[in-house]
């Protein structure tokens, strides 16, 4: 029997509504917007084909392998409520399509060429189910939440951070001075801005040295373990590891990486180095909005968060929720749980399309940062709980009396909120009152309350279910 050449509909091979998914399959939920005249089944099947074994025409080499064993399958399609001509297409991928321990390879297949496919007007990857059989091939975060708490000897409260501003232009010595003031005032961490790498006004080695001096001085004065996220992101992997090695030689606890601009291969290499050498790894998500902001095209952040948990990181930025709409709060808390918890049930109201079981992969601390200040502290404490990092950049450095009083104000506000919560008070209802009470005995907090009492960031939610 000769092989039959020609073009045939994808749905004849790749749309299989009777397929029962296997425990080892990687499952994907795509939001598909077909071109006019393309039926949803054909669009869903095209996604399955182009992200696995298919191409646009029948090829004779198909006969040299078992397509049934290796092909992706679109096994279910449902219309998106309230949207015209949008569908959720569920696709199952056999595990053997992917290299073990490689987020890079997984994404190259699942979100590769298929996103430029002409039969689709738009395509968004909403969620991925990573099976234990695949996640066990990854190291995951270098240390995880519990090990980090033990290293820092800090329990029972969120951790406090601050991004040093202005983000660009400070000399290394002035940068170190700003770090020292913040840590002395009561913060647990300070942070390199994501754009700070090794520029002419501040080379990385100078910054690392002045920062280490600030760290040891602040630790000696406060009796607490302190950290500064030293950004090791660089133009090459070799240079990145060189910076991490120098950080380790200085004896500091944590380094940082921009995982999307740096790339998953570099990130996974750095995560392995950090575990082997006892360094915590803070992850910034610069560039995420390019990928996840459009609601009908791209990749949802919950997928990027899962990918980071596989690739490795101990902290990752995760938005703030505060001052946004309720719908966004549920979606944000959905991926915060996917970062922290071992087992997360499917819950479409929070945007979670699949039950996710992480088995032995450690959890990641979500970092709330961006436009937050002391008046937000009760809401942040309630929403994110103890296992989080609350990061106030302008909300520390913008204090009228300087960095250290700004840090004091944040620490006092946090301790007051944690104590009130532990006493059974309702932070959502009594939050402002709790902050006012605390400001009576902390002049630093009173000054912060006064300067930021009118500031609000209220916009429509971009991300809806």
UniProtKB/Swiss-Prot annotation:
Species classification? Eukaryota, Viridiplantae, Streptophyta, Embryophyta, Tracheophyta
Task: List the Gene Ontology MF annotations in alphabetical order.
Answer: magnesium ion binding; monooxygenase activity; ribulose-bisphosphate carboxylase activity
* Coiled-coil positions: none
Per the record, residues carrying N6-carboxylysine are: 191
User: What SUPFAM superfamilies does the record tag this protein with?
Assistant: RuBisCo, C-terminal domain, RuBisCO, large subunit, small (N-terminal) domain
Could you state what the record's PTM comment says about this protein?
A: The disulfide bond which can form in the large chain dimeric partners within the hexadecamer appears to be associated with oxidative stress and protein turnover.
Q: Which UniProt keywords apply?
A: Calvin cycle, Carbon dioxide fixation, Chloroplast, Disulfide bond, Lyase, Magnesium, Metal-binding, Methylation, Monooxygenase, Oxidoreductase, Photorespiration, Photosynthesis, Plastid
Q: Which reaction does it catalyse?
A: 2 (2R)-3-phosphoglycerate + 2 H(+) = D-ribulose 1,5-bisphosphate + CO2 + H2O; D-ribulose 1,5-bisphosphate + O2 = 2-phosphoglycolate + (2R)-3-phosphoglycerate + 2 H(+)
Its recorded name reads: Ribulose bisphosphate carboxylase large chain
Q: Which PANTHER family does this UniProt record tie to the protein?
A: RIBULOSE BISPHOSPHATE CARBOXYLASE, RIBULOSE BISPHOSPHATE CARBOXYLASE LARGE CHAIN
Originating gene: rbcL
Where do the annotations place substrate binding?
113, 163, 167, 285, 317, 369
Functional description taken from the UniProt entry:
RuBisCO catalyzes two reactions: the carboxylation of D-ribulose 1,5-bisphosphate, the primary event in carbon dioxide fixation, as well as the oxidative fragmentation of the pentose substrate in the photorespiration process. Both reactions occur simultaneously and in competition at the same active site.
Cofactor: how bound: Binds 1 Mg(2+) ion per subunit.
Q: Where does Mg(2+) bind?
A: 191, 193-194
- Subunit field text: Heterohexadecamer of 8 large chains and 8 small chains; disulfide-linked. The disulfide link is formed within the large subunit homodimers.
């Amino acid at each position: 029997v000769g092989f039959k050449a020609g073009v045939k509909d994808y749905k004849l091979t790749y749309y299989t509504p009777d397929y029962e998914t296997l425990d080892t399959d990687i499952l994907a939920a795509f939001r598909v917007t077909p071109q006019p005249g393309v039926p949803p089944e054909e669009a869903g099947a095209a996604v399955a084909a182009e992200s696995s074994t298919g191409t646009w025409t029948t090829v004779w080499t198909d006969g040299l392998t078992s397509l049934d064993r290796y092909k992706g399958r679109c096994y279910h399609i449902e219309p998106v409520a309230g949207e015209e001509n949008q569908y959720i297409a569920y696709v199952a991928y056999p595990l053997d399509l992917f290299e073990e321990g490689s987020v890079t390879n997984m994404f190259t297949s699942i979100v590769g060429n298929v996103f430029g496919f002409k039969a689709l007007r738009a395509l968004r990857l909403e969620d991925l189910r990573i099976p234990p059989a695949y996640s066990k091939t990854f190291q995951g975060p270098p240390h995880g939440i519990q090990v980090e708490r033990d290293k820092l000897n800090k329990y029972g409260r969120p951790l406090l951070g601050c991004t040093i501003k202005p983000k660009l232009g400070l000399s290394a010595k002035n940068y170190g001075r700003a770090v020292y003031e913040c840590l002395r005032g009561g913060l647990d961490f300070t942070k390199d801005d994501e754009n700070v790498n090794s520029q002419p006004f501040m080379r990385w080695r100078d910054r690392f040295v002045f920062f280490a001096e600030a760290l040891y001085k602040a630790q000696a004065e406060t009796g607490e373990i302190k950290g500064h996220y030293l950004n090791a992101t660089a133009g090459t992997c070799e240079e990145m590891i060189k910076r991490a090695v120098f950080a380790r030689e200085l004896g500091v606890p944590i380094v940082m990486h921009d995982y999307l601009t740096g790339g998953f291969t570099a990130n996974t290499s750095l995560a392995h180095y950090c575990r082997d050498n006892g360094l915590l790894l803070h992850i910034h998500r610069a560039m995420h909005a390019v990928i996840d902001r459009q609601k009908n095209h791209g990749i949802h952040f919950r997928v990027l968060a899962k990918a980071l948990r596989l690739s490795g990181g101990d902290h990752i930025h995760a938005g703030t929720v505060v001052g946004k709409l309720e719908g966004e709060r549920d979606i944000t808390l959905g991926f915060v749980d996917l970062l922290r918890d071992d087992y997360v049930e499917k819950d479409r109201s929070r945007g979670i399309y699949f039950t996710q079981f992480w088995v032995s992969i450690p959890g990641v601390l979500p970092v709330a940062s961006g436009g937050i200040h002391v008046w937000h502290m009760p809401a942040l404490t309630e929403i994110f709980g103890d296992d989080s990092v609350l990061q106030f950049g302008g909300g520390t450095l913008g204090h009228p009396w300087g960095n250290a009083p700004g840090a004091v104000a944040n620490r006092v506000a946090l301790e007051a909120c944690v104590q009130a919560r532990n006493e059974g008070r309702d932070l959502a209802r009594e939050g402002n009152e709790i902050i006012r009470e605390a400001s009576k005995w902390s002049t630093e907090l009173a000054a912060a309350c006064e300067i930021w009492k009118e500031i609000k960031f209220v916009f429509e939610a971009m991300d809806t279910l």
